A protein has these predicted regions:
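Residue-level detector of short, conserved catalytic/binding motifs and their immediate flanks
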Residues: 35, 92, 252
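Acidic/His-leaning functional-site neighborhoods
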Residues: 272-274
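Signature for HUH/AEP ssDNA processing cores
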Residues: 1-87, 99-106, 111, 118-230, ...
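A generic structural motif
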Residues: 89-91, 328
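C-terminal accessory/binding modules appended to enzymatic or scaffolding proteins
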Residues: 239, 246-249, 255-266, 276-329
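Basic amphipathic alpha-helical segments that dock to polyanions
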Residues: 332-333
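A short beta-strand motif that forms the metal-chelation/ATP-contact edge
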Residues: 92-98
Length: 343
């Protein structure tokens, strides 16, 4: 069927029906649905798909952390029911098929997503087990994230070359977290005040050891930043992919099919390969291209700037650049609207 009717993209239902052959949805009789976690790199704070390799690295790390920090230790999910796929474009799917969870309705699935995102999480309470190396979930993420956040705040306080970018990223993440929780927003001025407090070495060391009270009136802001900077991103701008997880009638891309916006294959692989620091990490920009690899196609770049990688070949391109690339690369660039083929 598929070879005879080439189509833009191919999907299948993650729901189970008593009468799937019925034409009307009301007559199919819903029986349950798989759990889908769709992590998409689009619109991540500080990340752009114009740096396509960098974006995929970030979202691959997020997908691995989602399973390693939450789904397995917090919820007891088993790898026996897990299918991992590269979406063919900007992210990864964690497809969980445990029959014991098929019955979960949208509200139950929304609660699961809310916990992962840290909505309503008591970061202050998590500090009670700050030095417990065996703690998982949000306690673990709080413990590991505080030193990282402090490093960022110190760079802001020192007016480092990276200060503006770091400030923008932190502010965007914080703004989204506070919006979801219905809290009043905090601007860059407040973050700058907090950052300046970390120029004091003794205070910095105390906070790194979990003594958040040393920040006085700004400790609440610090804890909100910890939460927002450590949260798992389940969607573009915090919305799109939550819908994927809570939707009990969702369709998802068919593994081995091609993504119509890139020409890349929706690729299934073992969970262990999701770890970029592992012995055999999955590399979408090598493994998901299916067309020719020989450099025999001339293209002209039609966007201002982009960072690209096709296998071992890296490119930093700008408007008007002309490249000789493989059929796979030319297909990707054309479908993305980033280049045109030159005869």
């Amino acid at each position: 069927f598929l070879t005879g009717r080439a189509m833009h993209s191919c999907f299948y239902s993650t729901a189970y029906w008593q009468k799937p052959h019925e034409l009307k949805m009301d007559n199919k009789i819903w029986q349950g649905a798989d759990l889908i976690f769709d992590l998409d790199g689009d619109h991540l704070p500080g990340v752009t798909d114009r740096d396509f390799p960098g974006m995929l690295d970030v979202i691959q790390d997020q997908a691995y952390a989602l399973w390693n920090d939450f789904l397995e230790p917090e919820f007891g999910f088993s790898e026996d029911f897990l299918q991992v796929t590269f979406s063919g474009h900007r992210g990864f799917h964690l497809h969980y098929r445990d029959p014991a969870l098929f019955h979960l309705d949208s509200e139950a699935r929304r609660e699961l997503v809310s916990h992962i995102r840290g909505e309503g999480v008591d970061v202050q309470g998590g500090l009670t087990r700050y030095n417990d190396a065996k703690a998982n979930g949000w306690t673990k993420r709080i413990r590991t994230q505080i030193p990282t956040l402090i490093e960022k705040l110190v760079l802001i306080a020192e007016r480092n070359d990276e200060a503006n970018r770091i400030m923008k990223d932190l502010h965007l993440s914080l703004k989204e977290t506070l919006r979801r929780e219905g809290k009043p927003g905090k601007g860059p001025t407040s973050i700058q005040k907090l950052a300046d407090m970390f120029l004091h070495e003794e205070r910095r060391n105390a906070v790194e050891n979990g003594q958040i009270s040393r920040l006085g009136a700004l400790q609440g802001l610090f804890l909100d930043l910890v939460k927002s900077d450590a949260s798992i991103v389940l969607g573009a701008a915090g919305e799109t992919d939550e819908v994927v997880t809570i939707d009990v009638r969702r369709q998802i891309r068919w593994p081995t099919s091609l993504h119509g916006k890139t020409g890349m294959r929706v690729t299934e692989f073992q969970f262990s390969r999701l770890d970029r620091d592992g012995s055999n990490p999955f590399d979408a920009l090598t493994e998901a291209f299916v067309f020719g690899r020989d450099k025999n196609t001339n293209v002209e770049i039609v966007v201002d700037d982009a960072t690209l990688r096709f296998g071992e070949n890296n490119y930093d391109v700008t408007l008007g650049d002309k490249l000789n690339v493989s059929e796979s690369a030319a297909t990707f660039l054309s479908l993305k609207g980033w280049a045109k083929v030159v005869i």
